[in-house]
Amino acid sequence: SRRILWNTLGEMDRAFGLDLEFRQNDLTVKLSNGSSIVLGGAQDRDEVDKWRGPKYSLAVIDEAQSMRTSILSTLIEDVLEPATLDLDGSIWMFGTPNASSSGFFYDADVFERSSWSRHNWTLLDNPHLPGAGAWLERRKEENGWDNETPIYRREYLGEWTRDEESMVYRFSADRNVVETELEEGFWD
């Protein structure tokens, strides 16, 4: 993500003459109005803690579906929410639905936490990909996918679709849950 964003910012600077100042040593881009864009990771608690301290008017988390719930919830609730408070800032999360349909990003999207605004789109909604429809039909045919195939629905339609086949430990409520009442004191 960092490399992609860094290169994209460089392309935008050249295309639009934004007069951005790139500081590669700390992955910071200075804007002419005095604002900064800081790129970095948050894969573990040490990296999350590096975001403590400054105030942010906007914090953006890309590929949020890939982050462990404990890390993402700590980053948002313990670090970024307090850091955006002073400037009445915002936190944006982006990502593609994951195969497990679980985690902080899933909960924020599906259960519509009151503080989160939801937005979604499909590959076909992108106006910069004029051949996307034909490409996607070829991809579906090459892979033997139909409109119900979980990877197709997640990656190209942006839908939360649990994919039991891609799980390390496949869980099925029919197979793994037993409906029975235990005798009182069973666990004693």
Question: Model segments located where?
Answer:
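Short, surface-exposed connector motifs at secondary-structure boundaries
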Residues: Y56, V60, L87-S90
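Walker B catalytic acidic pair
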Residues: D62-A64
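Short, conserved catalytic or adaptor-binding loops enriched in Gly and charged residues
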Residues: T28-S32, D107-S115, N176-L182
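ASCE P-loop NTPase helicase motor core
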Residues: S66-W145
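Catalytic micro-motifs at enzyme active sites that drive phosphoryl/nucleotidyl and oxygen chemistry
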Residues: E47-K50, L80-E81, Y106-D107, E179-T180
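ATPase catalytic-site recognition across NTP-hydrolyzing enzymes
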Residues: P127-D188
